[in-house]
Amino acid sequence: MKKITSFTIDHTKLNPGIYVSRKDTFENVIFTTIDIRIKAPNIEPIIENAAIHTIEHIGATLLRNNEVWAEKIVYFGPMGCRTGFYLIIFGNYESKDLIDLISWLFSEIVNFSEPIPGASHKECGNYKEHNLDMAKYESSKYLQILNNIKEENLKYP
């Protein structure tokens, strides 16, 4: 079988950051998949389930309610390896184009004080597994990277 693109990235050299994972075109519409890498793979501890679940709920809600980006958001969700998230958006974007949006998103999560969106048994298949404090902690650590972003945090190795 042919390797998928994400498996061709050298994860031993991958830093936390914002990366264009791939671009796809369907019926003349470009979709850009963004790798929101929060942890250095196989070096830092992965994000615990309850925190990543909470970031997913808050993040998806905030992105789909963002006045500028809402109509461009296709998907926001966690990576199976639990080192970050994928964001799929309509349009042709580069990593640097998303710095402000992703910085805003994680800043909002750090300051989030409302009930976690979609965290009831009617709205979520695993509604009991959330941890807002850890979601804020992980988001705060990632913001430190975003606030000092370098080229090595924007292009795959």
From Swiss-Prot:
Cofactor note: Binds 1 Fe cation per subunit.
Cofactors named for this entry: Fe cation
EC number(s) given by UniProt: 4.4.1.21
Reaction(s) the record says it catalyses: S-(5-deoxy-D-ribos-5-yl)-L-homocysteine = (S)-4,5-dihydroxypentane-2,3-dione + L-homocysteine
Keywords: Autoinducer synthesis, Iron, Lyase, Metal-binding, Quorum sensing
InterPro entries in UniProt: LuxS_sf, Metalloenz_LuxS/M16, S-ribosylhomocysteinase
Keyword flag Iron: yes
Its biological purpose: Involved in the synthesis of autoinducer 2 (AI-2) which is secreted by bacteria and is used to communicate both the cell density and the metabolic potential of the environment. The regulation of gene expression in response to changes in cell density is called quorum sensing. Catalyzes the transformation of S-ribosylhomocysteine (RHC) to homocysteine (HC) and 4,5-dihydroxy-2,3-pentadione (DPD).
Family classification: Belongs to the LuxS family.
Name of the protein in question: S-ribosylhomocysteine lyase
Top-level taxonomy: Bacteria, Pseudomonadati, Spirochaetota, Spirochaetia, Spirochaetales
